[in-house]
């Protein structure tokens, strides 16, 4: 870029046309029009091209995805070597997986990307952690093509029964016995953190409710102060806390393992349940990479675990709904 900046400065009378697939180079040419060459028909000597439109998305992202022919999956995180990136790249081998950072960035990018006329040839979806989202929040996101797993965080995927059974069998262990021990360990940890988890879930809900309710116009500071004083009674944090705590107690009493994985945000859980030790791995990281290595294989085990991941993300149902919608659209006839 420095070389070409110098050359352009020396010859302001010239128009420079660059042909490049280098994203950094293309985005480094400031204040220039970017022509996206989609294809070339040598028989008719015809080019199919478009000017990349200005969008809320970054130029780097637009250029990177312009020549991509696969559906795009946007995920959280900045590190291309993160667990999320490695796992979802293997779970969705036919998609281009792109980390974006925050969950809000994923949600906004999916919405914007799907609205772009120039990118109508590409389908895009997103994945965000469930964290402490309510069922209503999750359903809203799924309707917007944002996949939300039925586990609280990505590490919990490695505690799914299908994953544990598959890895135990591959390691020559008793799958039923190991799964039973893991379930007991997870349940014990959950019981010890029920109050804390109920409080954290309550905090998330109240924070979201405050953001919605405080976003109002006030004629004066007194009106705003009055509104804020009334918020506690309107939001009823203790009522939400008691409801959530009772719900979590019911999950524990029912030994609802999948229900606990859905709501339990606790980073040390995978390490504390000692699944890696039971399977002969030195650390939780070794176990995780063992699962990832298995997913790279062309085996029935990889297919089984991949399907379990897609199911927990509701990706299988999303695909079925889209196919059903396309079928209904194709069957619709216009009556003159």
Model-identified regions with their sequence ranges:
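Activity-critical C-terminal alpha-helical subdomain
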Residues: 129, 133, 140-245
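Switch/connector loops and helix/strand junctions flanking conserved nucleotide-binding motifs
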Residues: 24-28, 43-46, 82, 134-137, ...
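Conserved interdomain hinge at the start of the Helicase C-terminal
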Residues: 56-67
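Conserved helicase/translocase motor-coupling segment
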Residues: 70-153
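Short, surface-exposed amphipathic charged segments that create phosphate/polyanion-binding patches used
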Residues: 49-56, 110-118, 159-169
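Extended, basic/helix-rich recognition subdomains
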Residues: 213-336
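Switch/communication elements of ASCE P-loop NTPase nucleotide-binding domains
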Residues: 1-57, 287-331, 335-336
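Conserved catalytic network of the ASCE P-loop NTPase/AAA+ motor domain
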Residues: 7-12, 64-66, 116-119, 138
């Amino acid at each position: 870029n420095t070389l070409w900046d110098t050359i352009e400065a020396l010859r302001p009378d010239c128009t420079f046309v660059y042909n490049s697939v280098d994203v950094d180079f293309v985005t480094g040419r400031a204040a220039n029009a970017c022509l996206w060459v989609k294809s070339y028909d040598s028989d008719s000597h015809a080019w199919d091209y478009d000017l990349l439109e200005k969008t809320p998305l970054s130029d780097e992202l637009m250029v990177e995805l312009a020549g991509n022919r696969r559906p795009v999956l946007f995920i959280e995180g900045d590190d291309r070597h993160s667990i999320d990136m490695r796992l979802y790249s293997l779970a969705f081998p036919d998609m281009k997986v792109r980390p974006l950072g925050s969950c809000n960035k994923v949600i906004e990018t999916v919405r914007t990307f799907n609205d772009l006329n120039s990118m109508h040839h590409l389908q895009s979806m997103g994945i965000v952690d469930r964290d402490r989202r309510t069922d209503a929040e999750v359903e809203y996101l799924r309707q917007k093509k944002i996949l939300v797993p039925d586990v609280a965080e990505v590490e919990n995927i490695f505690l799914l029964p299908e994953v544990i059974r598959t890895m135990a069998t591959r390691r020559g262990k008793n799958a039923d016995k190991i799964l039973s021990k893991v379930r007991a360990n997870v349940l014990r940890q959950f019981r010890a953190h029920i109050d804390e988890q109920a409080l954290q879930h309550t905090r998330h809900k109240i924070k979201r409710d405050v953001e919605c309710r405080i976003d109002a116009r006030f004629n004066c500071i007194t009106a705003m102060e009055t509104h804020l004083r009334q918020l506690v009674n309107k939001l009823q944090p203790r009522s939400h806390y008691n409801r959530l705590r009772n719900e979590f107690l019911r999950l524990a009493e029912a030994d609802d393992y999948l229900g606990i994985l859905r709501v339990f945000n606790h980073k040390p859980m995978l390490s504390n349940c000692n699944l890696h030790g039971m399977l002969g791995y030195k650390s939780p990281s070794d176990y995780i990479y063992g699962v990832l290595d298995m997913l790279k294989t062309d085996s029935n085990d990889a297919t089984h675990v991949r399907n379990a991941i897609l199911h927990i993300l509701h990706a299988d149902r999303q695909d079925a709904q889209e196919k059903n919608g396309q079928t209904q659209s194709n069957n619709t006839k216009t009556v003159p």
